[in-house]
Amino acid sequence: MVATTVATPFSNLLFSSEKIEVEKKYTINFFTKPLDKYGYDFMIDTLKMGGVDGLDLTVRPKGSVLPEKVAEDLPLVAEMAKKNDLFLEMMVSNITGAETPHAKNVLKTAAQNGIKHYRMGYFRYNDYEKAKETIANAKTQIQSLMGINAQYGIQGGYQNHTGNYFGAPLWDLMVVLEKVASPWISSQFDIYHAYSEGYRSWQVSMEMMAPKIGSLAVKDFTWEINNGQAKIKKVPLGQGIVDLDGFFKNIKNLNIVAPITLHIEYPLLEKHEENLSLIEKQKIMVAKIQNDVQFILSKLHQYQLI
């Protein structure tokens, strides 16, 4: 058991039912990658107008906050978010284990500034080791974070990602999470990637993963066929083929309570809009963010989650 003096993860992994009722169950947090190249003022202002509840801040190489500058820059972003009534309870990292450069300082600083959940870095299957070896290595690395996470009161989440990534088929991640058996290590269940990998079987994977889900990633896509080759095209929520109704229905039926991270990976600006003034660009971005936020809110209401 984790000592009572340590904060508990804010997903359903450790929440009591009484605690859940007090908190906002499904905060909508924006994965800040599309805004990383802009300044903090612009990012915060855009997200406030976009209607999100908070930030899923990139704290990683080439991110909004660089790991080596986390002690300087993360408190600044946290203060700016607070002044604008935005949560900063989530971040995206490149941390795969205790030995990742700056890992301990990033997690300590994040926890000190109110972040409760972080997405971990990835492991990949490769040609020079067998799949079982990759899974065993992932387990060892993930286990190395258990004590650090518990010490600082911050929960790690591993995102399932399409391709040759550990976690893509979900069963491999489930095996590791069951063996690790820590509330401080969770799944960031990504419906987009679950659907693209398991077109007709994703619901089975979600049901099995439900007790381990610490956060929910939402985005949409469709298929494009060019010269006989299928390629993913990322689109606004509701304009693709991802079974988002099934996803939100499952959240209700499986009693999953976790923060939502909204991933906008289709272009916030088209090429012909890149030369517009910053104000005009912001108007376009805000409108797109608002549309996706409203879509999520409509589904949360439809399935009586809020």
PLM regions: where:
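Acidic (Asp/Glu)-rich catalytic clusters
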Residues: 20-23, 44-49, 68-88, 102-115, ...
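Surface-exposed, active-site-proximal loop segments in enzymatic domains
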Residues: 65-70, 97-109, 122-134, 227-235, ...
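Active-site acidic/histidine proton-transfer and metal-coordination neighborhood
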Residues: 3-11, 44, 96-186, 286
